[in-house]
Amino acid sequence: MAKKIVAIIKLALPAGKANPAPPVGPALGQHGVNIMAFCKEYNGKTSDQVGMVIPVEISVFEDRSFTFVLKTPPASVLIRKAAGVERGSNEPNKKNVGSITQDQLREIAQTKMPDLNANDIEAAMKIVAGTARNMGISVKD
């Protein structure tokens, strides 16, 4: 029989740098999960993506064991990296802070495809382009 899930915890952590300090410690500790075991496993699986923020969904079971699923980095992080800017515009409709090309947009959409609710790459590109526009980053042809 399958183990019963007690909680699902969603966190966005820097790749390869999870440690027992907040936010990881308190989130897992209240469910009785072995925090160090999670940190070691997470850091091991994300060590090749250092510098990115990787969302993770942790399922905690009745016997305090856990499994986790890594998601793709947030679109905003990928867009900022592609545009080479530190942060998005504070007035997105008035002031542009950078731009990305169609090729970069397609690459980001392909990376995000598993987590996006889109049927094809064109729809995914529109979703990512909308995110970029809301950050004050234009998409060049």
From Swiss-Prot:
Keyword Signal recorded: no
GO molecular function (one): large ribosomal subunit rRNA binding
GO biological process: translation
Pfam families reported for this sequence: Ribosomal_L11, Ribosomal_L11_N
PTM description: One or more lysine residues are methylated.
A cellular component annotation (GO) from this entry: cytosolic large ribosomal subunit
Classification via CDD domains: Ribosomal_L11 (cd00349)
Domain of life, source organism: Bacteria
Membrane spanning stretches: none
Alphabetical UniProt keywords: Methylation, Ribonucleoprotein, Ribosomal protein, RNA-binding, rRNA-binding
Subunit structure: Part of the ribosomal stalk of the 50S ribosomal subunit. Interacts with L10 and the large rRNA to form the base of the stalk. L10 forms an elongated spine to which L12 dimers bind in a sequential fashion forming a multimeric L10(L12)X complex.
HAMAP family assigned to the protein according to its UniProt record, in alphabetical order: Ribosomal_uL11
Its biological purpose: Forms part of the ribosomal stalk which helps the ribosome interact with GTP-bound translation factors.
Recorded family membership: Belongs to the universal ribosomal protein uL11 family.
Identification of the protein by name: Large ribosomal subunit protein uL11
UniProt lineage: Bacteria, Bacillati, Cyanobacteriota, Cyanophyceae, Oscillatoriophycideae
Gene: rplK
